[in-house]
Amino acid sequence: MKNITDSFVSLGHWPFAGSFGFNTDILATNLINLSVVLGVLIFFGKGVLSDLLDNRRQRILSTIRNSEELRRGALEQLEKARARLRKVEMEADEYRVNGYSEIEREKMNLINATYENLERLENYKNETLHFEQQRAINQVRQRVFQQALQGALGTLNNCLNSELHFRTISANIGMLGAMKEITD
């Protein structure tokens, strides 16, 4: 019980200039205000954040769908290329005497071009996914920061009024007068 009484007595005592110590006063350290602000941010920001993430997820899914459609198109091109390859192989059997090496070179060029096209489309899909993920993360960070800043400014504006300013100034003037009397 003595510790509680001592802590209330120490609330009225201000240390002299040049000293420092651990401030155990909950009201002076703004723990209550900070916890209220964080609680409000978490309560109201949760819905907005989930909406942002849902929207971003939908965009990413649509990008994935588009990439899959591009992949299907590339696979169709691959099938067409394989059909052409089979046709070329049949012609190769007919023209083996005339130019087997020329047909083989054309076949390899066709296969290489098709695989390069598939690799390019796969790289494009991966780059698009990575870019969309980074953009989503950056937008979520920016929105959360803006909402936190707006909430903090709103809380500060609601808490600060002229009566509070007047009481704070009066208390500080009284303490300065008391300190002056002590030093005199």
From Swiss-Prot:
It comes from the Eukaryota. Signal peptide: none annotated. InterPro entries: ATP_synth_b/b'su_bac/chlpt. The chain crosses the membrane at residues 26-48. In plastids the F-type ATPase is also known as CF(1)CF(0). HAMAP family: ATP_synth_b_bprime (MF_01398). This is ATP synthase subunit b, chloroplastic. It comes from Acorus calamus.
